[in-house]
Amino acid sequence: MVKGGNGSRKRKGDRFELAVVKDQERIGRWAAKLRQGGGEVVDIVSIEKCQDGRCTAHSHVSHVWLIQAKVGGYMNPVERERLVMEAQAISATPLMAWKDKGIQYKDIS
């Protein structure tokens, strides 16, 4: 029996994505893990009520982050470009999340 294959890696990735959602909620944002399946580049959407008044949508004020969670901390250039394009299309901020003594975030715009 082979251990540590794609199934194990997927479960590890799923657990990390849920940890990122919980971390986003901890810092005061609403967050949701997206259903995956068609090669989607966005793993998590996170929204925070805007405190600086720089953005409005239907008289609601918020900031939006599109997050790609990478357990190993590496995002290939194609994924990076796709995430940036998705974020630009809706005026969101693209973030990569990775694990290094807790959850770290990097704005990749």
What are these regions (language model features)?
Residues M1-S109:
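Catalytic phosphate/metal-binding cores of nucleic-acid and nucleotide-processing enzymes, i.e., regions
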